[in-house]
From Swiss-Prot:
<comment type="pathway">
    <text>Carbohydrate degradation; glycolysis; pyruvate from D-glyceraldehyde 3-phosphate: step 3/5.</text>
</comment>
<feature type="binding site">
    <location>
        <position position="407"/>
    </location>
    <ligand>
        <name>Mn(2+) 1</name>
    </ligand>
</feature>
<dbReference type="GO" id="GO:0005829">
    <property type="term" value="C:cytosol"/>
</dbReference>
<feature type="active site" description="Phosphoserine intermediate">
    <location>
        <position position="64"/>
    </location>
</feature>
<dbReference type="InterPro" id="IPR036646">
    <property type="entry name" value="PGAM_B_sf"/>
</dbReference>
<feature type="binding site">
    <location>
        <position position="444"/>
    </location>
    <ligand>
        <name>Mn(2+) 2</name>
    </ligand>
</feature>
<feature type="binding site">
    <location>
        <position position="187"/>
    </location>
    <ligand>
        <name>substrate</name>
    </ligand>
</feature>
<dbReference type="Pfam" id="PF01676">
    <property type="entry name" value="Metalloenzyme"/>
</dbReference>
<dbReference type="GO" id="GO:0004619">
    <property type="term" value="F:phosphoglycerate mutase activity"/>
</dbReference>
<dbReference type="InterPro" id="IPR006124">
    <property type="entry name" value="Metalloenzyme"/>
</dbReference>
<feature type="binding site">
    <location>
        <position position="64"/>
    </location>
    <ligand>
        <name>Mn(2+) 2</name>
    </ligand>
</feature>
<feature type="binding site">
    <location>
        <position position="463"/>
    </location>
    <ligand>
        <name>Mn(2+) 1</name>
    </ligand>
</feature>
<keyword id="KW-0464">Manganese</keyword>
<feature type="binding site">
    <location>
        <position position="445"/>
    </location>
    <ligand>
        <name>Mn(2+) 2</name>
    </ligand>
</feature>
<dbReference type="GO" id="GO:0030145">
    <property type="term" value="F:manganese ion binding"/>
</dbReference>
<dbReference type="InterPro" id="IPR017850">
    <property type="entry name" value="Alkaline_phosphatase_core_sf"/>
</dbReference>
<keyword id="KW-0324">Glycolysis</keyword>
Amino acid sequence: MTTTKRPIALLILDGWGYRENTHMNAIFHAKTPVLDRLNAQYPHGLISGSGLDVGLPDGQMGNSEVGHINLGSGRIVYQELTRISKAISDHEFETNPALCDAVDSAINAGGAVHIMGLLSPGGVHSHEEHIEAMCRMAVARGATKVYLHAFLDGRDTPPRSAKASLSHFDDLFTTLGHGRVASIIGRYFAMDRDNRWDRVSQAYELITQGKAKFQYDNAVTALEAAYARDENDEFVSSSAITDVDGKVATLQDGDALIFMNFRADRARQITRSFIHPDFDGFERAVVPKMHFVTLTEYAGDITAPIAYPSENLVNTLGEVLQNRGRTQLRISETEKYAHVTFFFNGGKEEPFEGEDRILINSPKVATYDLQPEMSSTELTDKLVAAIESTKYDVIICNYPNGDMVGHTGNFDAAVKACEAVDTCIGRVVEALAKVGGECIITADHGNAEQMTDETTGQAHTAHTSELVPFIFVGRDATIDKGGKLSDVAPTILQLIGETIPAEMKGKPLIHIKE
C-alpha cells in the first residue's frame, strides 16, 4: 500500500462551476494564477453537483445544503424536494399525520390555517407546488380560513419573477373557494440566517400583528408597488394584504401555522421566534398560542411537530473518521459554517469525537458585493495555522465567496471574490507542501460562472447546473471521469488508507500511480 500523506484538506469553493460560455463568467474573467497553475500541474477533472446525481429532480440545479450532504455522506441522498414531491404525486402528502393534525386543530378551535414559506419554483428552500398542495389539502379537510404568508425569492429565481407565482395563487384560492394571500415580504427579511434579528422581526410582526410598511388589497398590486420603489423580490418590504372589508389576517391563539420550507438553514431563526418560550432575538409584542408544524427537521432545539423527519445517515465521512480514531477539522465563515458541520455530517448537530470546528464571522455588510473578499484572509490564517500544526488527518474547509457574491448579481464584485479565493488557495497549498499534506479542490454547485441571464438580460443570481472542478494537489495520480459529489468521501478515505464502509455507494476517483 502507498504511504499516506497528512493532512488531506478538502477545499470546497462554494458556487464555483465550470462553464464553456465565457460571457459574464466571473470565474473565467477573474485573474486566478494559482488555480491556473494547479490545473496545469496536477490531475484534474469535472464532477456533477446537480440533478439526479445529488438526489434532486433531473435538471434541478444543485445547492449548498444538498452538495454538502452528498460530499460528506459518500452516497446520493434523496433530497426533501424529491421526497415531498413524490409524497404529493403518490397522494401520501394529504394524509401526513403532522399536517393533518395542524389543520384539524385549527378547524376544531374555530381558527385559521396559516401557511408560510418561500413562494418560489426555485426548489432550493421550498417549492411552490408543495405550498399549493398544502393549500388544497387544508381546504379539502374543511378549513375555510386559509392564509398564505408569502416570502418572495429573487435569489434562486430571476430577481423580479414573483408575479407569476402570486397570480397563480390568487387564481388557486378563487378556484378553491376559500383562502387568500395574506402578506408578502422578501426573503432577505424572513429568511435571514446571520442573527440579523431586525430583519426577522419585520416578518414576525407582519404575520402576528399585521404590522407592515405597506398595505394593499391585492398581492400583485403590492408587488408592482415594490418594483416601483425599486425593490426586487428578495428585498420586498413588509406588505399586508387586506380582505374585501379592509381587514388584515394575523396569527391568533388557536390557529395553525405551517412552515413549508424544506431547507433548514434559513428556516431556523424565524421558527425560533415563533416557538421558543425564552426567545430573545427581539421583543415580541404578541406570542400566539398556536399549533406550529415544520415541513422538515430544522434543528435539534426546535421541538415542533415535523411532517417529514430527516432520514438517519450512518457512516458519513465524519463518523468513519471518528470510529477509526482519526482527527478532523471543519472550518468556514458564518454563511457556510452549518454546511461544513451539520450538513456535511448528514444532519447531525453534535461534533464527532476528534472533530474540531472553527467559525470565522462573515462580515456584517448588507450584501456581500460590498466586501467580496468576505472574511477569506482571516479564514485562511486559521486554516494555515491548523495545517502547520499537523494536528489533523482530514480538514474540511468552505470558501463561501463565489456563491455569496454570485447571489448579488454583481459581476465585478464576483470577479473580485474569485480572485480573493485564488490568493487564499495559494497560501493553503504552500502550507500543505511544507508539512507534506495534500488537497482536493472542488465545489458544491455552480453560481459565479454565470452572472447574467442569457434570455432576459437580467442579473443571474441563482445557482447553475454546471459541472464543478475537481483537482488533486498531491501525489502523481489519475482521476476517473464522470464523477459526482458523492464520490468525494470515499476518495478521501482511500487516500488516507482507510476502508470504505458499505453505506458509501460513491467510488474513489483518484488512483495513485505506484
